[in-house]
């Protein structure tokens, strides 16, 4: 999806030499996106397995529900650590590139919202034992915010704001 949108809405290239933090920031961001994407896929499989279990359907040979849940939260936990590191690297990178550490733009706001959603999810899981569809909904909300942080911010900046201007 990201590649397709990059082809349809090409942007300006980033200058990697602008900051030594940029390659680290990009690598951490890509890794965190990958982990959260894996978490979303596992959450969808978990929802399917839970739905089959509630309907009394035969087991389709997939992973057991508890295994899917455990894997989903491992992906979320690892993704959260990398997203936190991504935001920290971006904070340092922003200081060097923009002259201030935090720029209030679409990318920053959506990234912060996704971080908060994942923090709430992990806190709720550890403190209150959130499981099943409640946890999956919060995961999906965080993933949507994360998707909007990159793809959405480019779409807003390059398509919507360009049409208004």
What are these regions (language model features)?
Residues 13:
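Gly/Ser-rich phosphate-binding catalytic loop and adjacent alpha/beta segment
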């Amino acid at each position: 999806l990201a590649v397709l949108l990059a082809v349809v809405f090409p942007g300006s290239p980033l200058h990697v030499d602008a900051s030594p933090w940029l390659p680290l920031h990009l690598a951490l961001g890509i890794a965190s996106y990958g982990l959260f994407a894996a978490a979303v896929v596992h959450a969808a499989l978990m929802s399917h397995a839970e739905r089959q279990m509630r309907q009394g359907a035969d087991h389709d040979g997939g992973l057991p529900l508890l295994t899917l849940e455990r894997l989903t939260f491992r992906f979320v936990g690892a993704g959260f650590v990398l997203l936190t590191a991504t935001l920290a690297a971006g904070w340092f990178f922003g200081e060097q590139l923009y002259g201030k550490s935090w720029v209030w733009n679409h990318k920053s706001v959506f990234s912060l919202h996704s971080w908060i959603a994942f923090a709430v999810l992990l806190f709720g899981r550890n403190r209150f034992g959130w499981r099943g569809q409640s946890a999956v909904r919060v995961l999906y909300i965080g993933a949507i915010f994360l998707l909007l942080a990159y793809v959405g911010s480019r779409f807003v900046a390059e398509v919507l704001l360009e049409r208004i201007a």
